[in-house]
Amino acid sequence: MSFPNSSPAANTFLVDSLISACRSDSFYSSSASMYMPPPSADMGTYGMQTCGLLPSLAKREVNHQNMGMNVHPYIPQVDSWTDPNRSCRIEQPVTQQVPTCSFTTNIKEESNCCMYSDKRNKLISAEVPSYQRLVPESCPVENPEVPVPGYFRLSQTYATGKTQEYNNSPEGSSTVMLQLNPRAAAKPQLSAAQLQMEKKMNXXANGQEPTKVSQVESPEAKGGLPEERSCLAEVSVSSPEVQEKESKEEIKSDTPTSNWLTAKSGRKKRCPYTKHQTLELEKEFLFNMYLTRERRLEISKSVNLTDRQVKIWFQNRRMKLKKMSRENRIRELTANLTFS
């Protein structure tokens, strides 16, 4: 862009005119003190007339207050400042005015009034009329409350609980607790039923004890002759089947406490040996853990067992000793350690 008569004044006027033309959108000054340099003849085509915002003034015109201004769609208030009869006014499409922000009374609001009733009672009486229009008609102004959506109603869920808390009635609270926890009401009935069952078990146990005593006394009464007892002892030593029967009878006669044939849990141990046999085998095991063939045959003849039975018993006893020693060692090691 080149100008025929370019001078510093003309250049400054052009820059000032462009800046003022661009800035005239944001502010407007109707005072006579606004800076407006006179345009020259050379700059007529590049002056403020080309911008379409402010008309250029001649030297003879002094009235700066009647200056016309453009109407922009995003500033509807400027339309009242300008003179519509001016020839320099450029017509713009009519714009819609910005609606004023005002609350209407026909807005659909929640009609149910709920929470915060205690807090709203503390409001100053002077503040209530200013917000009277916002409160729905169904709610009185004296007790305005916050509407709550329909999916959660505080009055429906906690109405009974609030009334009981305010009235301080223990009977009502007990009924509510029974409604909330129905299992607590059934506990006394269950306890009564348990007491009845315990009484029945005790009566049955007392009735079974004399029967056991009679059963234990009856074999002794049957075997009254000493000769028959000696014969039975000889038969038991000779035949292993009779030994198993005797061991079963001993298990029945013993109490269910932990014995050498009964475990602590009450179940029967898998032990086909009698007391006499186990005592003899234990003595030999304490003397020597490993047996030779000759010694094993002698023990089997004395205890009335086969060679294979004595061999298996010693193997099992060694495994048991190994297990017990391992458990004792672990117990000693863990006793010295402190677990945090």
Swiss-Prot record:
<feature type="compositionally biased region" description="Basic and acidic residues">
    <location>
        <begin position="242"/>
        <end position="253"/>
    </location>
</feature>
<dbReference type="GO" id="GO:0000978">
    <property type="term" value="F:RNA polymerase II cis-regulatory region sequence-specific DNA binding"/>
</dbReference>
<keyword id="KW-0805">Transcription regulation</keyword>
<dbReference type="InterPro" id="IPR009057">
    <property type="entry name" value="Homeodomain-like_sf"/>
</dbReference>
<dbReference type="GO" id="GO:0000981">
    <property type="term" value="F:DNA-binding transcription factor activity, RNA polymerase II-specific"/>
</dbReference>
<dbReference type="Pfam" id="PF00046">
    <property type="entry name" value="Homeodomain"/>
</dbReference>
<keyword id="KW-0371">Homeobox</keyword>
<dbReference type="InterPro" id="IPR046333">
    <property type="entry name" value="HXA10/ABDB-like"/>
</dbReference>
<feature type="modified residue" description="Phosphoserine">
    <location>
        <position position="238"/>
    </location>
</feature>
<dbReference type="InterPro" id="IPR020479">
    <property type="entry name" value="HD_metazoa"/>
</dbReference>
<feature type="DNA-binding region" description="Homeobox">
    <location>
        <begin position="266"/>
        <end position="325"/>
    </location>
</feature>
<dbReference type="InterPro" id="IPR017970">
    <property type="entry name" value="Homeobox_CS"/>
</dbReference>
<feature type="region of interest" description="Disordered">
    <location>
        <begin position="206"/>
        <end position="259"/>
    </location>
</feature>
<protein>
    <recommendedName>
        <fullName>Homeobox protein Hox-D10</fullName>
    </recommendedName>
</protein>
<dbReference type="GO" id="GO:0005634">
    <property type="term" value="C:nucleus"/>
</dbReference>
<comment type="function">
    <text>Sequence-specific transcription factor which is part of a developmental regulatory system that provides cells with specific positional identities on the anterior-posterior axis.</text>
</comment>
<keyword id="KW-0597">Phosphoprotein</keyword>
<keyword id="KW-0217">Developmental protein</keyword>
<keyword id="KW-0238">DNA-binding</keyword>
<keyword id="KW-0804">Transcription</keyword>
<dbReference type="InterPro" id="IPR001356">
    <property type="entry name" value="HD"/>
</dbReference>
<keyword id="KW-0539">Nucleus</keyword>
<feature type="compositionally biased region" description="Polar residues">
    <location>
        <begin position="208"/>
        <end position="217"/>
    </location>
</feature>
<comment type="similarity">
    <text>Belongs to the Abd-B homeobox family.</text>
</comment>
<feature type="modified residue" description="Phosphoserine">
    <location>
        <position position="239"/>
    </location>
</feature>
